[in-house]
Amino acid sequence: MSPRKTYILKLYVAGNTPNSVRALKTLKNILEVEFQGVYALKVIDVLKNPQLAEEDKILATPTLAKVLPLPVRRIIGDLSDREKVLIGLDLLYGELQDSDDF
């Protein structure tokens, strides 16, 4: 069995809006179910830290970025569809590969 990777994620939000709160809640649920402690999530409020959004070229919120493992992947907007989030971040393939016990 190969060692599990640690996933480094950044969630960019704009304040404490309903969309931001929903995105964070949904994402935490996905991460706890799918990655059980092998992730680090940094939430960045672009209203409080606009320089970080500018450095990372964030144009819309919410934006979720998978920084590590490479390649970097981003999802912009609605994070409510678990499968789309996992596919968009290139995480579902590994999950499927690990469960090939047919």
Curated annotation (Swiss-Prot):
The gene is kaiB. Belongs to the KaiB family. One of its GO terms (cellular component) is plasma membrane. Key component of the KaiABC oscillator complex, which constitutes the main circadian regulator in cyanobacteria. Complex composition changes during the circadian cycle to control KaiC phosphorylation. KaiA stimulates KaiC autophosphorylation, while KaiB sequesters KaiA, leading to KaiC autodephosphorylation. KaiA binding to the KaiC CII domain yields KaiA(2-4):KaiC(6) complexes which stimulate KaiC autophosphorylation. Phospho-Ser-431 KaiC accumulation triggers binding of KaiB to form the KaiB(6):KaiC(6) complex, leading to changes in the output regulators CikA and SasA. Circadian oscillations can be generated in vitro by incubating KaiA, KaiB and KaiC with 1 mM ATP. The cycle is self-sustainable for at least 3 cycles and resistant to temperature changes. A very robust clock is reconstituted with KaiA, KaiB, KaiC, SasA, CikA and RpaA; output is measured by transcription from an appropriate reporter. Disruption phenotype: Not essential for growth on low light, loss of circadian cycle and rhythmicity. Cells elongate. The C-terminal region may confer species specificity; C-terminal hybrids do not all rescue deletions in S.elongatus PCC 7942. Has 2 forms, fold switches to a thioredoxin-like fold (KaiB(fs)) when bound to KaiC. The KaiB(fs) form binds faster to KaiC than wild-type, thus less fully phosphorylated KaiC forms; the KaiB(fs) form activates signaling through CikA and inhibits signaling through SasA. A mutant locked in the KaiB(fs) form binds the CikA PsR domain. It comes from Synechococcus elongatus (strain ATCC 33912 / PCC 7942 / FACHB-805). Undergoes a major conformational rearrangment; in the free state forms homotetramers with 2 dimers. When bound to the CI domain of KaiC switches to a monomeric thioredoxin-fold (KaiB(fs)). Monomers, homodimers and homotetramers are detected in solution; at low concentrations only monomers are seen. In vitro forms KaiC(6):KaiB(1) and KaiC(6):KaiB(6) complexes. Only associates with 'Ser-431'-phosphorylated KaiC (and not with doubly phosphorylated KaiC). It comes from the Bacteria. The keyword ATP-binding does not apply. GO terms for molecular function: identical protein binding. It is a peripheral membrane protein. One of its GO terms (biological process) is negative regulation of phosphorylation. Keywords: Biological rhythms, Cell membrane, Cytoplasm, Membrane. 'Kai' means 'cycle' in Japanese. Changing K42E: Disrupts circadian rhythms in vivo. The lineage of its organism: Bacteria, Bacillati, Cyanobacteriota, Cyanophyceae, Synechococcales. Induction: Transcribed in a circadian rhythm with maximal expression at 12 hours and minimal expression 12 hours later; expressed as a kaiB-kaiC opperon. Down-regulated by KaiC. It is found in: Cytoplasm; Cell membrane. This is Circadian clock oscillator protein KaiB. Changing K42A: Loss of KaiA binding. HAMAP family: KaiB.
